[in-house]
């Protein structure tokens, strides 16, 4: 006699292993039930062990997924082995293809699970924007200088050689050279200006006057150029000197007159190198807004050249006709009060303001390196102009004599 429980088990086994039509539905039902049982057992295990370990959870979930795929593979193979006995080959093949497509879709779902990311999308976008801004910020000074060159306002020794050559060609037409000579003769007769020095000579001459940099930073001396720089900062609505604002600045207020911007920028470069530590620590608001490079070029360099102007033209006699000494008098150089005298500095400021045109037209087109003098003379010969009359060499020799 068969017990009730045994009969039920036989019926269940028959439902699972029968080759009759519809047995595939029973198999799917069993697979779904088995799947839920696996999840239930696994959830119970996770609740009792390592509930707070994300890495172990992920490992168990991965193993469960692999087990499910393996069970489905085995069940599918067993089912098709049974079905192949009762169905034609074409129907069996079609069923196999359908099952394989379903299996591939399930595997794709498992593979396409997104990885956990520490950064949110909005955080990533903000970082990208910040990096782009930093990269753009690095281009500001170069763009500003290049735009100023196009306006014939500025020349930087840091430009690439092709930029220098194109600018020199632009300023070397016959008409410009003739005009340059006219401007030179006019200003030399009116102000008795000193000769233009080459860059190495200029840096050697202005070196004793560079301590004014620290005195300006420490507020020990008032500065006309610092005053103009501070006004530009206060009138700005931006946190730093932008390209647009730089283009709108009146550079005549930040130019050391007859020395020209080309030599002024060379002095600014030297100041930035020598006083890098002081310029990067405890920066005043005006310096931060301008940036170290521009602050050195348009504030500290012209102030240094102002002191040098007082010495070169001997403004202590309140006359621009005094003969320029060849060497620095040590006694005067050691007395800052002499060069910091407000009356003397006002005389120098006025002279530099009155000779800005000379600096732009004459000084900035004169050779700044000694080897450039030969190029200048070759250009004069090409234009069939008298070398002795038009070259800058003549004015350096005549002035020294």
Curated annotation (Swiss-Prot):
What Gene Ontology terms describe where this protein resides (cellular component)?
Answer: cytoplasm; nucleus
PTM sites of type Phosphoserine: 23
Which keywords appear in this protein's UniProt record, sorted alphabetically?
A: Cytoplasm, Nucleus, Phosphoprotein
Asked if the keyword Phosphoprotein belongs to this entry, the reply reads yes
Give the top-rank taxon of the lineage listed in the UniProt record for this protein.
Eukaryota
**Where is the protein localized?**
Cytoplasm; Nucleus
Q: What InterPro entries does the annotation carry? A: RTC4, RTC4_C
Q: Which Pfam families match?
A: RTC4
Q: Where is the composition biased (Basic and acidic residues)?
A: 35-48
Q: Where is this region: Disordered?
A: 35-59
| Family listed | Belongs to the RTC4 family.
The record's function comment reads: May be involved in a process influencing telomere capping.
Q: What is this protein called?
A: Restriction of telomere capping protein 4
Q: Which organism is it from?
A: Saccharomyces cerevisiae (strain AWRI1631)
């Amino acid at each position: 006699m068969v017990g009730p429980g045994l009969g039920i088990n036989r019926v269940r086994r028959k439902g699972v292993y029968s080759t009759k039509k519809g047995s595939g539905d029973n198999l799917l039902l069993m697979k779904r039930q088995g799947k839920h049982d696996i999840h239930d057992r696994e959830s119970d295990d996770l609740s009792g062990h390592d509930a707070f370990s994300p890495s172990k959870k992920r490992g168990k979930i991965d193993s469960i997924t692999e087990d499910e795929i393996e069970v489905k593979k085995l069940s599918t193979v067993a089912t098709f082995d049974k079905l192949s006995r009762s169905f034609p080959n074409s129907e069996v093949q079609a069923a196999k293809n359908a099952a394989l497509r379903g299996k591939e879709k399930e595997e794709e779902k498992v593979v396409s699970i997104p990885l956990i990311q520490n950064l949110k999308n909005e955080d990533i976008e903000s970082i990208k924007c910040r990096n782009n801004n930093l990269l753009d910020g690095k281009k500001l000074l170069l763009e500003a200088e290049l735009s100023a060159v196009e306006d014939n306002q500025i020349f930087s020794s840091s430009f690439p050689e092709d930029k220098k050559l194109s600018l020199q060609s632009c300023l070397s037409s016959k008409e410009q050279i003739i005009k340059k000579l006219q401007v030179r003769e006019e200003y030399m007769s009116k102000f008795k200006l000193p000769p233009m020095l080459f860059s190495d000579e200029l840096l050697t001459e202005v070196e004793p006057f560079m301590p004014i940099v620290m005195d300006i930073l420490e507020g020990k001396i008032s500065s006309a150029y610092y005053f103009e720089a501070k006004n530009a900062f206060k009138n700005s609505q931006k946190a730093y000197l932008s390209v647009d604002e730089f283009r709108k600045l009146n550079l005549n207020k930040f130019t050391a007159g007859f020395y020209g911007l080309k030599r002024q920028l060379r002095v600014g470069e030297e100041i930035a190198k020598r006083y890098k530590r002081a310029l990067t620590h405890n920066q005043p608001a005006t310096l931060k807004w301008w940036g170290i490079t521009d602050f050195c070029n348009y504030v500290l360099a012209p102030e240094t050249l102002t002191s040098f102007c007082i010495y070169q033209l001997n403004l202590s006699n309140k006359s621009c006709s005094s003969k320029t000494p060849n060497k620095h008098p040590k006694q005067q150089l050691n007395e800052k009060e002499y060069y910091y005298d407000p009356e003397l500095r006002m005389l120098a400021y006025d002279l530099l303001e009155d000779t800005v045109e000379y600096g732009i037209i004459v000084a900035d087109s004169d050779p700044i390196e000694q080897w450039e003098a030969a190029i200048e003379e070759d250009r004069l010969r090409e234009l069939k102009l008298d070398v002795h009359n038009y070259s800058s060499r003549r004015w350096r020799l005549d002035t020294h004599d």
